[in-house]
Regions:
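Sec-dependent signal peptide recognition
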Residues: 4-10
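C-terminal motif of bacterial Sec signal peptides marking the signal peptidase cleavage site
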Residues: 16-19
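Extracytoplasmic cell-surface/polysaccharide-interacting catalytic and binding patches
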Residues: 21-251
Length: 251
């Protein structure tokens, strides 16, 4: 009887110890779970950081690729770059033409130019059938010297090319004239030309505010034949130099 009472008296103590042991295990389990969650969170943060670094590196790589300049080639007569649809001749103050390079007017460019003139005339613009197209090295030398004699070299260099540096020598450039024989400057006709020249494969070569790129003052009358890629250049709003990433500006 005494033993039974002793057991009964000890039973609450035993149950209390068991309960404490269970609580301790649960606490340890919770602590371990928290540790796992914390570790997983840390790993996730590390992964996110790595992904961010990877994205940053990728962006820097793309930026470097975009800023890469186009390779300019020289074949002994002229400089050129490879465009989307073929070779594009570059003639500016940094890229001269050989003195003996005399291709005449490019047949494809001339045909497109004549269509351009005909369409402008049909729309009522006062455009002459006469124009200024191909010029030989010698012709350009005489023309440039006449401007130098009149206004000095510094002034002449802002609007006339020295011999060997003129786009007219490529046979791909044309100056439009009005019916009075003057270079085309009439605002409505000039605006139409600037907006629509690319549909005929041309770009208005010397744009306003782009003297530091092209090397010349704006010329609303001077168009340069490019072909199909003229539309890409027009839509970009860039000069030929800026579009292809080639050096331009002054001599």
């Amino acid at each position: 009887m005494i033993m039974k009472r002793t057991i009964l008296l000890c039973l609450p103590t035993i149950l209390l110890l068991v309960a404490c042991h269970q609580n301790t295990n649960q606490a340890n389990t919770t602590k371990n779970s928290s540790t796992v969650i914390s570790t997983t969170s840390s790993q996730s943060t590390s992964t996110t950081s790595e992904q961010s670094t990877s994205s940053s590196t990728s962006a820097e790589t793309n930026q470097e690729a975009t800023s890469t300049e186009t390779q300019v080639n020289f074949n002994g007569s002229y400089y050129s770059v490879q465009g989307k649809y073929g070779e594009v001749i570059i003639a500016n103050k940094k890229h001269p033409l050989a003195a003996d390079y005399a291709p005449g007017e490019n047949p494809e460019a001339l045909a497109a130019f004549q269509r351009l003139i005909a369409d402008m005339q049909a729309l009522g613009f006062g455009i002459s059938n006469n124009y200024s197209g191909f010029r030989s090295y010698e012709t350009q030398a005489n023309l440039y010297q006449s401007y130098v004699n009149q206004e000095g070299q510094a002034a002449a260099d802002t609007y006339s090319a020295r011999a060997g540096y003129s786009e007219h020598q490529t046979g791909l450039a044309f100056d439009l004239l009005d019916t009075s024989g003057n270079l085309l400057e009439e605002p409505n006709a000039s605006q139409w030309l600037a907006t629509n020249a690319h549909l005929y494969g041309f770009i208005v070569r010397y744009l306003p505010g782009k003297e530091s790129s092209t090397g010349y003052m704006a010329e609303s009358w001077h168009v340069r034949y490019i072909g199909q890629e003229a539309t890409d250049i027009y839509n970009s709003g860039l000069t030929l130099e800026e579009y292809f990433g080639v050096p331009g500006g002054d001599y």
